[in-house]
């Protein structure tokens, strides 16, 4: 049994009692990376020398019994800036970018005395559902190396599933925490929009992006969200909501819980094995005293189209800053200022990023704004209202995290429409801004299936309670890939 088979709480107790040291944990992390990284490719940049130094310092100082995360190794998605540690967003255009400040979540993790093992691979600028659009390399699913880990936080999920780190941070714009968590058999939380500061997150779509934790189990996830939540003056969209002790909500008692199951989430396009795993999970929750009814989120069908217009429009604006002038890659082949802009961007961005910038620029252009962007915003309002209406009568909404299990590497990369439509069960949650968690709920043909539990605004505590109660009745989260 390795050290990472223990939970956050168990490792904390061992550290306080000096049965193990932070140096032991960091060493275990790098030993595991050495053993499996060539197979999975979770990381872009490792932080070995610094991590070992921090671990020694923490060990010498002793672990504060009140600091649950002190001395524990974490991986951070490479679109979250880290001072003096290369941050690339998995793009050639930021290949050598060395930030001069930490993202707010990174500062909070440093205050919590976690130890950053390195920066995790992702789809370029978080645009993708498979971690195949990274400029550096593809990441492989630890459960089946011929398959994708999901995306865009594929490295964050694969590193946890492969035991390279204890937990990680990802970001979720349209499912980028929940879908990889489902594909890799781990737990991923997308918090309510505004719960976690976005300061220092390299922007994709600012009205949709949210940082969240990926962990082996629900309790660890709750501890990590406690550490990174809270109002931040540097982020005007962060909300002044008290930081709850989410870990206190893990009581196991869900008697009387009212669950809504959208008929749109278990209909056409959902793999039979995925559907069966979700229905079995609902039976487990019924045994625990919950009840469920079929409900409708009638505007879900507009989710993917609305999302790709709105997210691409915001991306076309956000990514205009990468022009070869201030930072990042600069084309050596330019002779005029206009050439500098065009060549830097055409050489520095990958195909998927360029596709979305062009789509967004088109949607915002004169004559098309009303037909596309404005209509997508109107559809977004209707999608949000669907959730508001269901939550009047139900406590949570439940469905699959993804309509399929992990697909083959190169299986969809040349078919963007099919890839986009695979996000159908996650993008409505981002459009509405509500929280959702993915927890392992079974297997289909040997591949993990994720159960998505969706809550009302700022009801992460309830999501943790339900997810934890389910987890305690099952063993799916204890299953490990055979690497």
Curated annotation (Swiss-Prot):
Its EC number is 6.3.5.7. The active site is at 77 (charge relay system), 152 (charge relay system), 176 (acyl-ester intermediate). Belongs to the amidase family. GatA subfamily. GO terms for molecular function: ATP binding; glutaminyl-tRNA synthase (glutamine-hydrolyzing) activity. The keyword Mitochondrion does not apply. SUPFAM superfamilies: Amidase signature (AS) enzymes (SSF75304). It comes from Listeria innocua serovar 6a (strain ATCC BAA-680 / CLIP 11262). This is Glutamyl-tRNA(Gln) amidotransferase subunit A. Heterotrimer of A, B and C subunits. It comes from the Bacteria. Pfam families: Amidase. Keywords: ATP-binding, Ligase, Nucleotide-binding, Protein biosynthesis. Allows the formation of correctly charged Gln-tRNA(Gln) through the transamidation of misacylated Glu-tRNA(Gln) in organisms which lack glutaminyl-tRNA synthetase. The reaction takes place in the presence of glutamine and ATP through an activated gamma-phospho-Glu-tRNA(Gln). The lineage of its organism: Bacteria, Bacillati, Bacillota, Bacilli, Bacillales. It catalyses: L-glutamyl-tRNA(Gln) + L-glutamine + ATP + H2O = L-glutaminyl-tRNA(Gln) + L-glutamate + ADP + phosphate + H(+). GO terms for cellular component: glutamyl-tRNA(Gln) amidotransferase complex. InterPro entries: Amidase (IPR000120), Amidase_CS (IPR020556), Amidase_dom (IPR023631), AS_sf (IPR036928), GatA (IPR004412). GO terms for biological process: translation.
